[in-house]
């Protein structure tokens, strides 16, 4: 099995694993709301833990020679992920901005689900390899 094929299969598994991690993150947020604020530490720590899956998705997409959307979409989610911490930082000075934290979480979940669902078709399609002069056969000299 080729390296690019392994990377495409890994991409699909990583994408669904990321969706599952986001669902766990929602659960931990609910735990903080309904079972006591001390549980928000679990929510915060878990969020910092699984974000690295997005980098793995980008790497797998590039190694797997997958379409542009397969690596660009996780990069977009990385931006949304980074915004989560920014929104929380405004909780005392600008609560209206901090209130965007759960809205952004829904955007992250939606994007993650789209990536995971699209991964099946991306797994089947890869960017065609470019031919280099060294890989092309020498032209025949037919007179």
Protein language model annotation of sequence segments:
Residues 1-143:
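Polytopic transmembrane helical bundles with strong interfacial aromatic enrichment
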């Amino acid at each position: 099995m080729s390296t690019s094929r392994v990377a495409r299969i890994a991409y699909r598994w990583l994408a669904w694993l990321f969706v599952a991690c986001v669902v766990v993150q929602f659960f931990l947020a609910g735990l903080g709301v309904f079972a006591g604020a001390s549980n928000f530490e679990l929510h915060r720590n878990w969020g910092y833990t699984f974000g690295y899956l997005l980098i793995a998705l980008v790497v797998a997409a590039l190694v797997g020679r997958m379409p542009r959307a397969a690596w660009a979409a996780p990069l977009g989610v990385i931006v949304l992920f980074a915004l989560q911490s920014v929104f929380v930082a405004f909780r005392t000075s600008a609560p209206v901005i901090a209130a965007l934290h759960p809205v952004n979480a829904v955007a992250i979940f939606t994007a993650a689900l789209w990536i995971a669902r699209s991964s099946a078709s991306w797994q089947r399609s890869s960017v065609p390899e470019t031919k280099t002069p060294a890989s092309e056969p020498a032209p025949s000299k037919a007179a």
